[in-house]
Amino acid sequence: MATTHLDVCAVVPAAGFGRRMQTECPKQYLSIGNQTILEHSVYALLAHPRVKRVVIAISPGDSRFAQLPLANHPQITVVDGGDERADSVLAGLKAAGDAQWVLVHDAARPCLHQDDLARLLALSETSRTGGILAAPVRDTMKRAEPGKNAIAHTVDRNGLWHALTPQFFPRELLHDCLTRALNEGAAITDEASALEYCGFHPQLVEGRADNIKVTRPEDLALAEFYLTRTIHQENT
């Protein structure tokens, strides 16, 4: 199928293990309902008609993915991921074909809402650099004293945002920025930070705070609650 300027490829780095979950099974393969977290995350992307393909970067020794129904989906491409997130994203970008824009989404972020995704994708019509889903910080923020669990001072939360995913950029721009940042030893914690390092200023698209990443054991029950609530709302 030929791609158009509106078609989008998504990249899902899924080669990590997530030791904070305290389980032997990588967190993306834990189940919520009758699907794994990874499947929830990927199907949320494929639910939008502009997302024509999802490239999933998995660990070379991963034996779990092939057992999922997702492995046989015609819109899924699988590549070997790397040791770091940025390496996996770059591997995914190389398999993204001629898509002009790419989404990058966390494998363990299963609660993405379609209205948030649609507003993020609309950036391709108005922006040359793209942007990210993000949620304004609402809690009081404290800076700790170096090496201590003691408060140094309160941080002004005005203008602070929690970075979420998906993150959405022109494919070539993201590839070039990630490559440069890695080659120059920059600290890259998400895709937007690579663009920031290269002098770009991606936009912030406010998204729902319940678009959580499953990182700790208690997050699993919370994600299950959010997903169950969403399914109930869609069916009423």
Swiss-Prot record:
Specify whether Transferase is a keyword of the entry. Answer: yes
E.C. number = 2.7.7.60
Q: What HAMAP family has UniProt attached to this entry?
A: IspD
Q: Which Gene3D superfamilies match?
A: Spore Coat Polysaccharide Biosynthesis Protein SpsA, Chain A
A GO BP entry is: isopentenyl diphosphate biosynthetic process, methylerythritol 4-phosphate pathway
Output the NCBIfam families linked to this UniProt entry.
ispD
The record describes the protein's role as: Catalyzes the formation of 4-diphosphocytidyl-2-C-methyl-D-erythritol from CTP and 2-C-methyl-D-erythritol 4-phosphate (MEP).
Site location (Positions MEP for the nucleophilic attack): R157, K213
Protein's name according to its UniProt entry? 2-C-methyl-D-erythritol 4-phosphate cytidylyltransferase
Site location (Transition state stabilizer): R20, K27
Pathway the protein contributes to: Isoprenoid biosynthesis; isopentenyl diphosphate biosynthesis via DXP pathway; isopentenyl diphosphate from 1-deoxy-D-xylulose 5-phosphate: step 2/6
Lineage per the UniProt record: Bacteria, Pseudomonadati, Pseudomonadota, Gammaproteobacteria, Enterobacterales
- Keywords carried by this UniProt record: Isoprene biosynthesis, Nucleotidyltransferase, Transferase
Quaternary structure and interacting proteins, as annotated: Homodimer.
User: Which family is this protein grouped under?
Assistant: Belongs to the IspD/TarI cytidylyltransferase family. IspD subfamily.
Q: What species is given as this protein's source?
A: Escherichia coli O157:H7
Question: Which transformation does this protein catalyse, written as a reaction?
Answer: 2-C-methyl-D-erythritol 4-phosphate + CTP + H(+) = 4-CDP-2-C-methyl-D-erythritol + diphosphate
InterPro entries reported for this sequence = IspD (IPR001228), IspD/TarI (IPR034683), IspD/TarI_cytidylyltransf_bact (IPR050088), ISPD_synthase_CS (IPR018294), Nucleotide-diphossugar_trans (IPR029044)
